[in-house]
């Protein structure tokens, strides 16, 4: 960075003397602007950067994070990048016609000036914009999220990436016809959009449109699902959610939300305990999650569900670590539909069981630990399958896809952590054939991969450290001895074989692979030894139906 000096003087040579009048006009205006600074503004630093930019003929001007309430009217005419983000700006001056990139996020802008004709990137998220000016044809990327925009102007043909999340848009813009080669990704999540224009089908199938958490009518959802399910469909991939985006942001005190799950004779004691956790991180959203959980299909229809939740809450009250993990898992669950809450409940039960395993609950019950590990493995495979399924769908709510595989296969795969009912299976796009294929794939991969996976599972390592300390120490010594004696040569051999010797990125990747292979070999040997001993003693078995 150049030395800071607010008292720039013009060099006394013929070149600068020729244009000194121009410089003087800039400097005089900037010095006057600096003297009008409000308390807390760093206008002296801003003027220093302005003068440096002008004298050095720099194409970038960065005035971000200076707490500025305004900018001078005459910005350097040659700049192609202007960054004024994280200030207190309520408006912008006339922008240089040369400007290609404008960053003015996290200000208080209510409107924008005329945009330069060559502008390629507009980043004005987190402001107070209610509308936008005409967008230049050159625009490639635009982020206008977290504003108050009700409608959009015509979108340039060149626009590749648009983020308009959390505004007040009531409709999508028209999408132009023709075989435009541009691959687009547009985000309109969490607006007020109730219908989808037919022009959305003009976009190519490589394009993606995100419209989650909007009040889409059931008619619009059904029509889109029908269109996108057609074998002849060649339009964009559309990501939606069954949420209408209108969840109540009010929440009641955490203790009240918790005690509602307990019988009346316990509520006073429970309230007193949970009152102490009111100010923990994510406590408010956890309270809202509990209230939404009570309105799920499982809560209404599953016998013993309330008792199950109450028992879980008791465990949370006794463990700060588990409570912190659970609050974090539930943090976003209230921002989507009922099935998102159900999927989060699945994840919370997984968190509890893995925590209990790590803390020693299964130290003396290897069979139960294997069963838990097997369930976690099956869930991981189902997540992989769901992820692949999402890629094949053109109209998709990812939450419904992930939950569908868990819910519909809960009984066949003995998934104790999965809810047995979901509300919107019909829009998941998961077919009966998908479920049969998924079950077969899980069982096949379990047969071939589970023991390797289990040998690297964190809770199993925690059990080994506590109950097989000597064997664990020997395994660690063997691992580090192998790394010390063989690691470098194995990495070098791998790089040479691939013709990437001397490539730093390839070396890091090869090193990670060698490390994984070493750990797999050592921990698999240890696991086989311990399981052979323990399972023969209690009659359990490694392979399970």
Swiss-Prot record:
Example of a GO biological process term: protein K27-linked ubiquitination
Region: Linker, residue numbers: 243-250
Catalytic activity: S-ubiquitinyl-[E2 ubiquitin-conjugating enzyme]-L-cysteine + [acceptor protein]-L-lysine = [E2 ubiquitin-conjugating enzyme]-L-cysteine + N(6)-ubiquitinyl-[acceptor protein]-L-lysine
GO molecular function: ubiquitin protein ligase activity; ubiquitin-protein transferase activity
Naturally occurring in which organism (per UniProt): Shigella sonnei (strain Ss046)
Function: Effector E3 ubiquitin ligase that interferes with host's ubiquitination pathway and modulates the acute inflammatory responses, thus facilitating bacterial colonization within the host cell. Interacts with IKBKG (NEMO) and TNIP1 (ABIN-1), a ubiquitin-binding adapter protein, which results in TNIP1-dependent 'Lys-27'-linked polyubiquitination of IKBKG. Consequently, polyubiquitinated IKBKG undergoes proteasome-dependent degradation, which perturbs NF-kappa-B activation during bacterial infection. Mediates polyubiquitination of host U2AF1, leading to its proteasomal degradation.
Active-site residue list: 337 (glycyl thioester intermediate)
Modifications the protein undergoes after translation, according to the UniProt entry: Ubiquitinated in the presence of host E1 ubiquitin-activating enzyme, E2 ubiquitin-conjugating enzyme and ubiquitin.
Renumbered residue ranges of the record's region E3 ubiquitin-protein ligase catalytic domain: 251-545
Residue ranges constituting the NEL domain according to the UniProt record: 253-545
Enzyme class: transferase
Family designation: Belongs to the LRR-containing bacterial E3 ligase family.
Protein name listed in UniProt: E3 ubiquitin-protein ligase ipaH9.8
UniProt keyword list: Host cytoplasm, Host nucleus, Leucine-rich repeat, Plasmid, Repeat, Secreted, Transferase, Ubl conjugation, Ubl conjugation pathway, Virulence
Self-association state and partner proteins as the record states: Also interacts with human and mouse U2AF1 (U2AF35).
């Amino acid at each position: 960075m150049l030395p800071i000096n607010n008292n720039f003087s013009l060099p006394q040579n013929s070149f600068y003397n020729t244009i000194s009048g121009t410089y003087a006009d800039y400097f005089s205006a900037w010095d006057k602007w600096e003297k009008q600074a409000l308390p807390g503004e760093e206008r002296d630093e801003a003027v220093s950067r302005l003068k440096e930019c002008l004298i050095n003929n720099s194409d970038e001007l960065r005035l971000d994070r200076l707490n500025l309430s305004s900018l001078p009217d005459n910005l350097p005419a040659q700049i192609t990048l202007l960054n004024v983000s994280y200030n207190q700006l309520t408006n912008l001056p006339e922008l240089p016609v040369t400007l290609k990139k404008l960053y003015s996020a996290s200000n208080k802008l209510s409107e924008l000036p005329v945009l330069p004709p060559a502008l390629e990137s507009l980043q004005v998220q987190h402001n107070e914009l209610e509308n936008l000016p005409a967008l230049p044809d050159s625009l490639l990327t635009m982020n206008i999220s977290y504003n108050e925009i009700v409608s959009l102007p015509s979108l340039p043909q060149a626009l590749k990436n648009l983020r308009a999340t959390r505004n007040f848009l009531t409709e999508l813009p028209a999408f132009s016809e023709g075989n435009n080669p541009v691959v687009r990704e547009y985000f309109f999540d969490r607006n007020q959009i109730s219908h989808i224009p037919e022009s959305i089908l003009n976009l190519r199938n490589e394009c993606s449109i995100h419209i989650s958490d909007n009040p889409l009518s059931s008619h619009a959802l059904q029509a889109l699902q029908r269109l996108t399910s057609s074998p002849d469909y060649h339009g964009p991939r559309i990501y939606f959610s069954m949420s209408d985006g209108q969840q109540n942001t009010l929440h009641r005190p955490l203790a009240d939300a918790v005690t509602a799950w307990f019988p009346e004779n316990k509520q006073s004691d429970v309230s007193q305990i949970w009152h102490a956790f009111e100010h923990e991180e994510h406590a408010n959203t956890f309270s809202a999650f509990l209230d939404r959980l009570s309105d799920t299909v499982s809560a209404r229809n599953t016998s013993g569900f309330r008792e199950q939740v109450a028992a879980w809450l008791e465990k949370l009250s006794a463990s700060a670590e588990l409570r912190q993990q659970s609050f974090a898992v539930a943090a976003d669950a209230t921002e989507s539909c009922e099935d998102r809450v159900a999927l989060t409940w699945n994840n919370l039960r997984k968190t509890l069981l893995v925590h209990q395993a790590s803390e020693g609950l299964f130290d003396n019950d290897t069979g139960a630990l294997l069963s838990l590990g097997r369930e976690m493995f099956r869930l991981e495979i189902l997540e992989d399958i769901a992820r692949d399924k999402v890629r094949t769908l053109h109209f998709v709510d990812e939450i419904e896809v992930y939950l569908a595989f868990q819910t519909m296969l809960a009984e066949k795969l003995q998934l104790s952590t999965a809810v047995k009912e979901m509300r919107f299976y019909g829009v998941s796009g998961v077919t009966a054939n998908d479920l049969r294929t998924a079950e077969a794939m899980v069982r096949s991969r379990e047969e071939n991969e589970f023991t390797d996976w289990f040998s690297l599972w964190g809770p199993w390592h925690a059990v080994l450290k506590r109950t097989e300390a000597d064997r664990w120490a020997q395994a660690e010594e063997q691992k580090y001895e192998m790394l010390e004696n063989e690691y470098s040569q194995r990495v070098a051999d791998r790089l040479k074989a691939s013709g990437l010797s001397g490539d730093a990125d390839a070396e890091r990747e090869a090193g990670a692979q060698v490390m994984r292979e070493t750990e797999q070999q050592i921990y698999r040997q240890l696991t086989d030894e311990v399981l052979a001993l323990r399972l023969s003693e209690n009659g359990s078995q490694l392979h399970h139906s």
